[in-house]
Amino acid sequence: MRLLHISDWHLGRVTYTCPRSPDHDRVIREITDIARDFRPHLICHTGDVFDSLRPSYPDLIRGVDALQALAAIAPVLVVCGNHDSPALFRLFATLLGKRSRLHFIDSARPPEIGGVLEFPGAKAEIIRIAPLPFVHGNRFVDAFEDSSTWMATYADRIQRIEDALGRGLTDGFDPSRHILIFAAHLHVTGAVFSGSERALHVTDTYASRLERIPQVSYAAFGHIHRPQPLPGSVTGWYAGSPIPLDFGERDEKKLVVAVEAEPSRPALIKTHELSGGRPLRRLAGTLEELQSLAPTVGDALCVVTARTKQPMSDLDDRIRELFPAATLLNVSEDCAARQLSVLGARDAPSESEPSFSEMFREYLAAEGTRGAEADSVLRTFDSLIRCVEQENEPLFPEMAALQRTLEESLP
C-alpha cells in the first residue's frame, strides 16, 4: 500500500501585503507531479487547506481544482483543520456525493456511522483509516460526548475520541489484509512549532497525549507547520506546510511524506522535498553590503533594512534597482543622522532634574526621526522651549520665508 501525506496549505495566506498564491501554485504543481510518479493508493491531506473560514472565490477554485487533480490520481481524504470551515467541508461533501474520489471530513464520527473508512490497497489489501478533524476546545463533539465530559480537560476529551476510533479500526481486523492509518489535525505534546501556527491552538491547553494515538501502521498529522516525525516511538509525521508561511519558517525544508506499508509490517517512510515557493529573506546592511548580496536574492520575498549616514529620499528606488526580481515586502532605513547618543549620568548635574531638551534628546536616541536629521529636530525643539520660557512668539527662518512667499503671491 502506498500513501501520500500532505498538509497545511493555507491557501489565501498573505505575508505582509503580498498574496502567496504564486508560491502555492508552484508547490501544488510539484505535489501533483510527485503523486503521479509515486502512484499512491490513497492521498491524505491532514487539514488547513485554506487560511481562513471564509476563503475567497479564487482560493476556493484553487483548492478544489488542486484536490480534484490529485483525486484523478488516487482517492483523496481531506481532514478539516482549525483554519478550515466545517460547514464548507459539509457543503463540498454534499455536492460531490458519496461516489466521489474526493472525501471531505468535517468532524469526527463514531466508527459505526462512518468514523472509519476503507480504501483498496495493493492486491487484496484494505486501507482502514480513522480521520480526526480539529476539535475546538469550546465545542462538543455530540457523538462522543455528553454532560459527564463538560469538565474534562481537552486531552481527556481527545483521548475519549481516539479510544473509540482505535476500537473501530481493530473491530474485525484481519492482520493479513488490513493496514491501519490514523489521520488527525492535532497538537501532540513534544512537537516542535514553527511559530506561525495560531497561537491559541498550540498551547498546553490544546495538547493531546501522544501515547494514546491508536496503534496503526502510520499516523498522519497536520496542524504544526514544521515538517517532522512524531515525537517518541510512534510511526508518523507532521507533513507541515508546503511553503514558508511567515519568517518563522524561512529556514525550514518543506516536503511531502510518501508511505509504503504492508499488513503486519512496519511502514517505510520517504520524504520528497519541495521548492517551498519563493524564499523569505531578511536583509540588512549598507547599500554596498546589500549590493554584494544581490546575486543570492533572486525572486525572494524580502524585508530590507538599509543602514545610511544621511536620509535618502530615493531609498526604495535604490533597493528596487539592487533586487529587480525580488518582491520587497518592507524597506526601512536605519539612518545614523536620525540617531542621537544617549546622555549618561556624567553629562548632567548630579542633583538636578533633566531638562526638556535632555529628555527629548533621550527620546530621539531611542526612537529616531521619520525624515529630518535628528540634530536639526533637537535645535528646533530647543528654540521652541526658549520661546515658551521667554514668552516670545516662535519665529523660524522657514516660517518667515513661507510668510513672505504667501504675501508676495497675494494681489
What are these regions (language model features)?
Residues 8, 28, 43, 48, ...:
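Divalent metal-coordination and catalytic microenvironments
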Residues 113-127, 132, 236-301:
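Binuclear metal-dependent phosphoesterase catalytic core
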Residues 1, 39-41, 74, 125, ...:
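Short coil/turn segments at beta-strand junctions that form active-site/ligand-binding loops
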Residues 260-411:
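Accessory, non-catalytic peripheral segments of nucleic-acid enzymes
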Residues 1-72, 383, 387, 410:
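N-terminal active-site segment of His-dependent metallophosphoesterases
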Residues 55, 64, 69, 77-234:
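His/Asp/Glu-rich metal-coordinating catalytic cores
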Residues 155-161, 248-250, 309:
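Active-site glycine- and acidic-residue-rich loops that bind
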